[in-house]
């Protein structure tokens, strides 16, 4: 069962790669592990866990559904949805999951599915339900990039009742989020995992902007989502440091000044310090910034 499930997931990975070579590293960043407790499949950012009977049934129904599920999990990782948590509100009596947590899960799923549905590749092309089309129409009214955080903000303003929330969850839920860091508050977050996916994210943006002539035609708003994500997390101070160079400038160099010799000279000769501080020092600065 382990081998069959792994074979199905590898086949999905390979089919996705044929059309989306800019995702090569992301698609190949997982090992595969059978887990009888998972609902379909899910990932923690390192391993894709699958329930063999459900995965096999999905593949027999339509392999495109497996392809979409694989890409869905990859996008969760690219945008680090697994690490998104927040202040919890009142808990539900039946399963202990907060409304806020359900809304975050739903927002992540909608954001990912919206990207997938906006991409024009045969390997993931699938008909959209009326509920899905109407949800997208309402979300797109603002005309802004629909990342998970923005979707969450809009959904919160809708004041969804239980029935509407459940209907949306059933429509957009694709994978099991139980393995996410945000679902394990007692477990220390792994900064290396977020850094790994951040670097993959950067590489994808570079590939799309530099090599993909069809970006924006077949990839929908995926590139714009990547740019938005990177802008929100990029440390521009670190970026500017790359352009700093060492040069000399006129200033007292206190760092190279030795007070021992200075005070010794004053003690020995009265008013003659043995060493004066240097009148220039090396500094690392950006010499000029040009705005165009």
Where are these regions (language model features)?
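Conserved small/polar residues in nucleotide/adenosyl-binding loops
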Residues: 291-292
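Short, functionally important secondary-structure microenvironments
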Residues: 1-67, 74-278, 282-283
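A short alpha/beta connector and helix-capping loop motif
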Residues: 287-288
């Amino acid at each position: 069962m382990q081998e069959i499930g792994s074979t199905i997931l590898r086949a999905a990975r390979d089919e996705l790669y044929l059309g989306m070579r800019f995702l090569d590293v992301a698609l190949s960043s997982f090992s595969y592990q059978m887990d009888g407790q998972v609902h379909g499949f899910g990932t923690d950012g390192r391993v894709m866990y699958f329930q063999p009977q459900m995965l096999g049934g999905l593949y027999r129904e339509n392999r495109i559904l497996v392809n979409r599920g694989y890409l869905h999990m990859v996008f969760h990782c690219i945008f680090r949805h697994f690490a998104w948590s927040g202040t919890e509100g009142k808990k539900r009596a039946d399963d202990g999951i907060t409304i806020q947590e359900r809304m975050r899960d739903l927002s992540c799923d909608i954001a990912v599915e919206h990207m997938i549905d906006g991409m024009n590749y045969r390997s993931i092309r699938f008909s959209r339900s009326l509920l899905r089309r109407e949800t997208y129409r309402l979300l797109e009214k603002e005309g802004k990039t629909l990342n998970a955080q923005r979707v969450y903000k809009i959904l919160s303003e809708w004041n969804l009742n239980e029935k509407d929330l459940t209907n949306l969850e059933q429509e957009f839920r694709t994978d099991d989020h139980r393995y996410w860091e945000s679902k394990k508050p007692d477990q220390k977050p792994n900064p290396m995992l977020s850094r790994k996916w951040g670097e993959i994210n950067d590489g994808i943006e570079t590939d799309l902007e530099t090599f993909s002539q069809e970006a924006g035609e077949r990839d929908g708003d995926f590139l714009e989502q990547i740019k938005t994500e990177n802008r929100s997390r990029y440390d521009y101070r670190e970026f500017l440091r790359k352009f700093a160079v060492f040069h000399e400038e006129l200033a007292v160099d206190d760092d190279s000044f030795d007070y021992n010799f200075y005070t010794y000279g004053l003690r020995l000769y009265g008013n003659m310090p043995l060493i004066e501080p240097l009148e220039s020092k090396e500094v690392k600065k950006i010499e000029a910034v040009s705005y165009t």
